[in-house]
Amino acid sequence: MLEKQHIQYFKNLVGGEDFFTDLAHLNAYCYDATKERHLPSGVIFPRNEQEISQILKYCNEHRIIIVPRGAGSGFTGGALSVSGGLVLSVEKHLDKILEIDTKNLIARVEPGVINKHFQNEVEKLNLFYPPDPASENQSTLGGNVAENAGGMRAAKYGITKDYVMAMRVVLANGEIIRAGKKTIKDVAGFNVAGLMIASEGCLGVISEITLKLLAKPPLKQSAMGVFNHIEDAMNAVYKTMSSGVTPVAMEFLDNLSIKAVEERFSKGLPKDAGAILITQVDGVVKEQIAWQLNEIEKHFKANGCVDFKIAQNEQEEQDLWFSRRNASQSISVYGKKKLNEDVTVPRASLPSLLQEVAKISQKYGFKIPCFGHTGDGNVHVNIMLEDPKKDLEKGHKAMEEIFQAAISLEGTLSGEHGIGLSKAKFMPLAFNHSEMELFRNIKKALDPNNILNPFKMGL
């Protein structure tokens, strides 16, 4: 609960239309994609960087918790206010594209710009912003930076960190810093921008981002490989990726995911397949596209692919990617609640990871449909609970074993969803005591009063 003096300060600062403590607003900002609920004490919508600075300075002086928030589309509770405090939302006012520099192929944006809107705007200029998280129609670029979001095109084009050139950040004490430059090369000083990426709002509030753009490839084409065994599909991934061909995307659905999508949408997927790989290539000339697809088909078939279909028109392209993008919602047929995480391993370890998941599924009796970005080793595992009240504890134990399997294969707890609340307790699986202390010391140096998004990331 905020004291009256604090309420009055925030109202005076941003006005009554941009600061709220009523239950309707608190309820609207108490949850994210996890559906877990934590009621904040207030919600504030700063109109500019200076207001962010004044808000943080005041909150730091009065020890008021601040939880930065974009669209609330995260899967780990990173934007939830677990101990009251103030949700600072950038979605209402800080949503402008400030500059698109076609000469230097960069753009400056405010943190509340929606990813897909930004993609659409730069494409009007024949430019290209590759990071395309599944939440691209909802998630903000500030949130993408805070989580280091990836997407399907990461196999060729990388993830958010590969496109962040610079940013402006408001620190916990209200000071404003610049991190990075518009230049391609910059080795002057520490890489503070890199430190802020994936920090989940624990180190500062991002107020502006400078992003790298690419020229848009004029041609693209997709294909699907069908495999009887999921291990064959996983082997095909790393052997194809190491052959000299670099597809834009290399995605997979396992048998459970295929069946779920077909049951819901009837897109013509092979329901008896052990797995499918959906891939896309791009380029400048048709011969380049044809060569890449031929090479992929060759490597797929050398590793157990029983059918290889190339999309022949735009509708077939859309159907392939519709199936992949809607796998997450389709698997709800298997349970009332899902525990979904996104472990990542080196590509060559994908067969071993999926074998371990199958063993854990059998051990605990849960259906665990899997799909994801195999081109970068990122697998979305979904433990389906038919009776959440009875099975939740057992489900968490199963997920912990999946985390342990990923770590044992030199992988990580999360490739793109982040740590937030849901994976915070598992951080010691991936980091030793000295490493966790380093994280805490960095947090303490930048936020000594621990007002910025506390309790996240195990900090």
Language-model features and meaning:
Residues 1-57, 73-105, 134, 255-266, ...:
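N-terminal flexible segment immediately upstream of the FAD-binding catalytic core
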Residues 38-45, 87, 106, 336-344, ...:
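Glycine-rich tight-turn/loop motif centered on a GG-T
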Residues 1, 24-28, 45-51, 58-61, ...:
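Feature of Fe-S/electron-transfer and energy-metabolism proteins
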